[in-house]
Amino acid sequence: MQQKLITFAVPCYNSAAYMRHCIETLLSAGEQAEIILVDDGSVKDETPVICDEYAAKYPTIVKAIHQENGGHGEGVNQGIRNATGLYYKVVDSDDWLDTDALQKVLARLHTLVTRGTAPDLMICNYVYEHTEDGTSHTVRYTNIFPQERLFTWMHVGHFRPDQNLLMHSVMYRTEVLRKCGMVLPKHTFYVDNIFVYQPLPFVKTMYYMDLDLYRYFIGRADQSVNESVMVKRVDQQLRVTRHMIDCQDLDALKGEKKLRAYMLHYLSMMMAVSDIFLLLDGSAEAKEKQKGLWQYLREHTSAAVYRSIRFGFGGVTNLPFPKGDAIVVGGYRIARKIFKFN
């Protein structure tokens, strides 16, 4: 039996209202794809039934896995454990893929695999779909990556603060995810950052297509990236940030300057996001948590890594003078209006 080109993992938790749209877009890949629907202990709706329905209807494509509730990360872990595809992509059940772009990506991957030049990481654009005002905007990487050719870290350009590789933009080779030993924490939101970050040192070759593949739904009141929800769940953001501080030794990457620079950029962004939502909380307890996070970074990284983050982008959100917090929050509000990232 020929190996599937790609495994799509779809963690589902009480997703009956919208998961069908997601699944139907993935089915457009046909027999090239394996679709793993992970029912994460859903009890409030027909999610388990829908998973089984698709598995019965498309037995050579769809697998349904039912697990005790473990959170989004455990859904991703479950997908990796069971994946048989050469590549692995996570698609959240309220998001979807553009079917035309998907056909082009899969055709290119098939060509690269046939030639023996399959990359460790395939990158595409993603699109924020804002339901509250019907607008959308695309995050693309044309200023960072060469297009339509295999490249390495030495060919990577500069990331702007509003640009990061997110789960939405990446397809990893499944063996890369297994080789890096990544296990996402259970019952924790925002683990998609770990999913992108931890495997990066194991990526030697990449390929970028300037296609708007992933459609990222923004607008549900209970969504994990909703601002008020993020403030309430800030402890989970801190847990993920600490995990990322610990999971890779950036000083071991000095021979890969651009890889190390990007991972410093990503970790700086995580520190900045944590700072902002602790500032939005505004309590004395949150202020202590902010101090504790920076102390954790100091104690668990080298002086060089700490300085790079503290006096770089990560430190912009931790201004040591009166009204510094107000300036940071004001800057966040302006950026949110411009980039509409949540």
Residue ranges and their predicted role:
Residues Y88:
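Short aromatic/hydrophobic "clamp" motif used to bind/position activated sugar donors
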Residues H72, D95-M206, Y214, I218-M230:
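Donor-binding/catalytic cores of nucleotide-activated saccharide
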Residues E24-A33:
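Short, acidic, metal-binding catalytic loop of nucleotide-sugar glycosyltransferases
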Residues M1-T25:
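N-proximal low-complexity "stem/linker" segments adjacent to membrane-targeting elements
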Residues D39-I50:
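A conserved acidic beta->alpha catalytic loop
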Residues L279-N342:
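Membrane-interface aromatic/basic loop that binds lipid-linked glycans or pyrophosphate carriers
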Residues Q67-A83:
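Glycine-rich, basic loop-to-helix element that forms the pyrophosphate-binding segment
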Residues L211-R220, N226-K254, M270-A303:
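Catalytic core of nucleotide-sugar-dependent glycosyltransferases
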